[in-house]
Amino acid sequence: MTRPLQFIPFKSRADKGWAEAWELYEKSFPYNERWSEEAYDRAFGDPNFEADGIWRGGEFIGILFHWGADGYRYVEHLAVSPALRGQNMGTAALSAFCRKVGRVILEIDPPEDDISIRRRHFYERLGFVANPYQSLPPSFRKPFTPHRLVLMSYPGAITYEEARSFADFVREAVLRYSEHEAPALPKLP
């Protein structure tokens, strides 16, 4: 019998497992899509933000960093330990998270190569829908360059108004932890 996954929020960088989580984070996401550790020090106190370590028994499985907004959770970062990839840990973690929280929005790279196409199919198998709205948020780190992303939502599509509200949320709640002094509004085409 497999042990259930647990989502245990980190409250500080001193918490058990943060070093493993940070190493996975740095290996899984490009520099411009990552915050600094100092930004996490500030974000840990934000009631809208949760940086979960994913655990099975005492074993560190991965990370799921997410935000609470009005009517949905925004999954900002999800990664599974490389040693456990291919064992459906990402599927199990995201499925459990979606069942628990309901409505979820996330962003992915446009499906333009094998990896990004597989990533989109992964989310679609879990019930996510690609929306016709692209977001262009600036990177978290200098130099600030917009990065075109596809909005995906669970369990169904979002409206243009919801996409606009999401863009406002990213600008007002999320980008304040980036290196931006006055983040520009992510634009929807």
Where on the chain are the PLM-derived regions?
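Short amphipathic alpha-helix that is part of the acyltransferase structural core
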Residues: 1-39, 149-151, 162-188
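Short strand-loop junctions, especially beta-strand C-caps/beta-turns
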Residues: 78, 83, 107-111
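Conserved GNAT acetyl-CoA-binding A-motif
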Residues: 100-115
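Conserved acetyl-CoA-binding loop-helix of GNAT-fold acetyltransferases
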Residues: 80, 86-99
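A contiguous, mid-protein "functional segment" used to position or interact
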Residues: 130-169
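Conserved beta-strand in the GNAT
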Residues: 53, 58-68, 72-79
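Conserved catalytic-core motifs of GNAT/GCN5-like acyltransferases
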Residues: 31, 107, 120, 124-144
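A short helix-loop-beta-strand connector motif used in the catalytic cores of GNAT acetyltransferases and
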Residues: 43-53, 145
